[in-house]
Structure formats: structure tokens, C-alpha cells
Amino acid sequence: MGQQQSKGELLYQQVSYGNSEGIRALHRDGGDLEWMDREGKTPLILACMNSELFDVAKTLIELGSNVNAYRPGRHAGTPLHHAAKRGLENTVKLLLSHGANPLVLNDDCQTPLEVARVKGFSNVVRAIEKHICLFSGWMREFYGPTFLDLFAPQLLSRRVWVVIVPTGSRNPTKPFKLELVVYASLQDAQPRTVMPLWKANLEEPKAKQSDTSVMIVDNSTIPSRRMKKRRVCASHGRRRPQVVRQTRLKFAPSTEGDSQQLKWFCDACKGIPQPMHPPVFLQAPPSAPPPPSEDGLAMGMNASLHTTMSDPSNLNHHSIGQASSSSGPSSSTAPPSGKASAFGFNSHGIGIVLESSPSAPPLTDDDIATVDDGPIHYPSIDSTPVDLPSAASLPASTEGERKEDGNTGTCAICLDAPSEAVCVPCGHVAGCMSCLKEIKSKNWGCPVCRAKIDQVIKLYRV
């Protein structure tokens, strides 16, 4: 007699039959939703490969199937990869609405968005970009020789669809890299231009100028072999200034004089999403711990407040994120006096913006002029050696406490998940995303200072 089939295999077979009721019955009897065939396909992956199995895919997701189940091998990946490859727009939207990660790379180093572009499914490309973009909209792109812009700028511009999206990465703990994508029309799946923003500089229009355009310069260097030869020649002879090949893109708002759209575009290039339409993947962590009970929240808040009162230095520390210097020059403007805008961002990823009350004396007119005209000077780092106590001499009670800088501590409420969310507007990094959202929904206030929480933002550390 042949080997008896498992309930998971029977459930897998019911997917190909389109039998949703049979799937529910087998799941109640213990059928495994993550059973894999010889090719590594789960029931959900199989359902996402056929447009006629949309209801089956919806049933599997409702029963708890893993929307990010990974199938190794060429032309494989997550359920979202398979749906994007076949142009199943409704299935793609279903997966995205239930937490599918659109930035996962398959074994071919492609995200679902890149798979849809290669296959030419513009509807799927628009659906994924709408879900993850920091900016999207019609703009005017200037082309042709630069000197002709002075004489006939309108004749040398064309209307293009511009999107700023994060790229995929093998390491989800690193900040996301951003790229600028330009399409000739909404019907195009393949972009006309793709520029990596972590290798580019943004030249914003100055406030006193009437020119409402922005230029992005790609400072990608010459290939490594030629650069190596140049360095060898420079070391043996007289040094010459190296000329770097540049790619320039110049944009203006689709409606002349629309400074608000231009500001949103410039902010998105720096990693700041639009305030009214932030990307969905920035609003919640991909895998959040279960919400704690009300008693646990209350105990955690009391313990956090007690710790803060005993250590007043924590009250004045607003940890927003670590910033790193860019490899090339960047243009920055000082925030208006009266409010300090803190922005944790480096040239390789997405930062978080939050406004807080000023913690330093206001800038004078001379200081503001210096900031506008010259580079920003950051405080120097004290490299004086510090005597630290050994691990054996530390008291045992400090093992589970949060570090003073708040960067690597755990949640002060559930004491389980990492402290990865910030309260707005007070700026305290007080806990994990799940706990702080629960506190905000109950209007309990910040666990550190009891201030009202207007928004909870997830931090992406460098």
C-alpha cells in the first residue's frame, strides 16, 4: 500500500481544486497551511499563481497563512513575487493589504516591483509603488543643453511621472536606500530613468530665487579599475583634480509656481514622506509583538515613570536616530527659530522627522547667515579615554535595564521587544511600536513624561 497523504498535502490539493470549504475543514482538523511540495510551494504561493484562485488565496490569508513565505530557487520568491510575475493586480493588492513585504529580494535579486517591471505589468507596478512610495506625481523634466534653459525653458520640458521608492535589501536591519524613478507615462511599466539617491546630491532652489526647479546630480564615480589607475598615477606624479562623470536631472512642478509639490519632492529625496500620505510600510513594523494587557501596560508605565524620575537626565534626551555624514556635499537649511526639527537620516536610508520644543538657545542673525552661506559644523566628539567598570563589578540588577542613550534598550513597558518607536511631539523613545500604539489608543500619554501622544513613529537605526 502507498504512503498515506498528510492533511497538509490534502489541503494543498484542495487549493488547486479551488475548494475553499474543503480548505477550512482540513485546517480545522489540523491541516498545515505551510506545507510545501517538492518545488517549495506553499498553498498560498500556489493560489497566488492563478487569477481564478483569488478567493482561495483570501481564505488562506484569513486562516493565517504566512504572506511572506519564501520559496527558494530561480524565478521564485514570496507569494507577492509570484502574483507580480503573472500580473495579478487584485492578488497583489490583497497581499499588500495583509502585510506582505514588497522589499524582499528573491534569489534573482529582484523585488516584486522589479519583477512586474520586467514582465511589463504597469497596473501591478502602479499598485506596488502606491503602497511604498514616498512621493509620486506628475512633474516637468527639463532636457537638452543647459544653456538653452535660459532662452526657451518651456520648449525643452516634458511631462513625466516621477516616483521615489525604497529599494530591496538582503539586510532588513539596515536603513532603506531610495531611488528616483521616472516614467514617460502611467501606461509604462519600464522606467525611463532610475537614479540611486544615495549616490546623488540635491540642489534645491533658494528662497530668494524665482526659479521653481530642483536639480539632482548623480556623483557616481568612474569604474573602479580606471579609478585605481588614476590613484596610482596621482601617487607617482603631480596630483590633478579628478573629474567625476555626472548625470543631471532637473525637475519643476507640473503646475507652474506649485511650491508645495516641489517641497514634497525635495523632502522625499531626503527620506521624508508626505505628511498626508506616508508609505504604509513605515506606519507599522513588519512583525509586531502581541499587544500587552491593560494591567501590563499600566505596570510598565509606572515602572518607566519611576525610573525616569530617579534619573532626571533621561527627561532631556530625545533619541531620534543616528545621522551619518554624506559622501558628497548636500544642501541644508536651518529650521525656523522657535521650533527645532530633528531628522535622523543618512545618505543610505529613510529618516524620521519630528518637531520638538527647542533645547538650545535661539540662533542669532549672524548664526543663521553662517548656516545659510557655509557648511554645517557639528559638535566635535570627545575622544578622551574613559575608565569603564568591568562586567564583574556591575550589579546584577542592571542587566535588564535600558541603556541611557535608548538606542539599544528594550521596551520599558513589555520588557521584551526592542525600543524602536518614538512619541510625538515629546520625542521620547519609550517602547516598542505595539505598546506605544496601545498607549496612544487609550490616551494614557508618554510613559516617560506623561505628555499627550499625537503620533507614534517607528525608528530605523543605522
Swiss-Prot record:
Biased composition annotated in UniProt, kind: Polar residues: 304-317
Q: What does the UniProt keyword field contain?
A: ANK repeat, Metal-binding, Repeat, Transferase, Ubl conjugation pathway, Zinc, Zinc-finger
GO biological process, any: protein ubiquitination
An example of a GO molecular function for this protein is: zinc ion binding
**Which SUPFAM superfamilies is this protein grouped with?**
Ankyrin repeat, RING/U-box
Extract the Gene3D superfamilies matched here.
Answer: Ankyrin repeat-containing domain (1.25.40.20), Zinc/RING finger domain, C3HC4 (zinc finger) (3.30.40.10)
Q: Where is the composition biased (Low complexity)?
A: 319-341
Q: In which pathway does it act?
A: Protein modification; protein ubiquitination
Q: Where is this region: Disordered?
A: 277-341, 356-402
EC number annotated for this UniProt entry:
2.3.2.27
| Zn finger intervals (RING-type) | 411-450
What's its job? No E3 ubiquitin-protein ligase activity observed when associated with the E2 enzyme UBC8 in vitro.
What name appears for this protein in its UniProt entry? Answer: Putative E3 ubiquitin-protein ligase XBAT35
Which source organism does the UniProt entry give? Arabidopsis thaliana (Mouse-ear cress)
Q: Which gene encodes it?
A: XBAT35
